[in-house]
Every structure is written in C-alpha cells, then in structure tokens.
Amino acid sequence: MDKVKYPVLTEKTIRLLERNQYCFDVDLKASKTEIKQWIQDFFKVKVVAMNSHRPPKKKKRIGPVLGYPVRYKRMIITLESNYSIPLFLNK
C-alpha cells in the first residue's frame, strides 16, 4: 500500500514495543480506518487502538532555496496482547 510509508524505529518507539505498540509513518491523506484495515489484513493482527499526530513543519535550506520537506502523519498502533508484528521481533 502506498499510504503506509515505513516503520519508525527511534528510542521512544523501541520503548513502545514493550507495551505492544508499533509506530509507522503514513501519508497525510490516509485515514485511521484505512490504515487499521491494511495493518490487520497485511500482518494478520488485531488492532485495539490507534493514535496519530503530525510532526511540526520544519524549514530546510538547499543552497539559496528555502523550503519544507515532505509532510507525513505518524501512527501509533496498539495491538492485542497475544499479537505482534514480525518486522520488529528480535532474533
């Protein structure tokens, strides 16, 4: 799916893994229901809750041109306790 860009792995999101929460960057136009349906179908998991936020806009300079990088929405997805996403498993 084009709307889910990639999983996010930072110090905070690694701490969220202990609470069975996973973080993804998604397209701004994607709705929670679309993302929830895609996550459940693709990973065969049960989603309990979803939280989303848009990180603040930041300026970026490339030579004399000042612009903004591509915007995205960050989704924090909580799964039922007996499910997990294999992308994030330690081996």
From Swiss-Prot:
Subcellular location per the Swiss-Prot or TrEMBL entry: Plastid, Chloroplast
SUPFAM superfamilies: Ribosomal proteins S24e, L23 and L15e
UniProt cross-references to PROSITE patterns, sorted A to Z: RIBOSOMAL_L23
Pfam families documented for this protein: Ribosomal_L23 (PF00276)
Example GO molecular function: structural constituent of ribosome
Record keyword Plastid present: yes
GO biological process: translation
Annotated signal peptide: none
InterPro entries named among the record's database cross-references: Nucleotide-bd_a/b_plait_sf, Ribosomal_uL23-like, Ribosomal_uL23/eL15/eS24_sf, Ribosomal_uL23_CS
Protein keywords: Chloroplast, Plastid, Ribonucleoprotein, Ribosomal protein, RNA-binding, rRNA-binding
GO CC aspect terms: chloroplast; ribonucleoprotein complex; ribosome
Keyword Transcription regulation: no
Main location: plastid
HAMAP family xref list: Ribosomal_uL23_B
Job of this protein: Binds to 23S rRNA.
Subunit and interaction comment: Part of the 50S ribosomal subunit.
Family: Belongs to the universal ribosomal protein uL23 family.
UniProt name for this protein: Large ribosomal subunit protein uL23c
Naturally occurring in which organism (per UniProt): Anthoceros angustus
Taxonomic lineage: Eukaryota, Viridiplantae, Streptophyta, Embryophyta, Anthocerotophyta
Gene: rpl23
